[in-house]
């Protein structure tokens, strides 16, 4: 529509994030299946920033904490075997599957270092997939 230049979307490797129950939206396509939609938005000139890519992993005390393995079923073996934290895996995945940036929670310098590493090396874990789609 050329009315918007940027969208901040609630998305995870498992698909859309459900704000109501703080999990993956029931019936949501997984992020791989959302890629054509994300590519269409980017081709129209819209930047996409991912929100909540790590929230479901960490959770909150009043929600029963998180589930650090929840996205593992969406990852291939090289990503699962990479020396990355569960948060780094999630950020790397969403960055290489249609997003321009990810809004990541950072409360310590260690978080900043981990998040930078995930962003800077994300393409390394998906080189084969990228080569096959080019």
Feature-to-residue mapping (PLM):
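Structured C-terminal cap/extension of enzyme domains
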Residues: 3, 8, 15-134
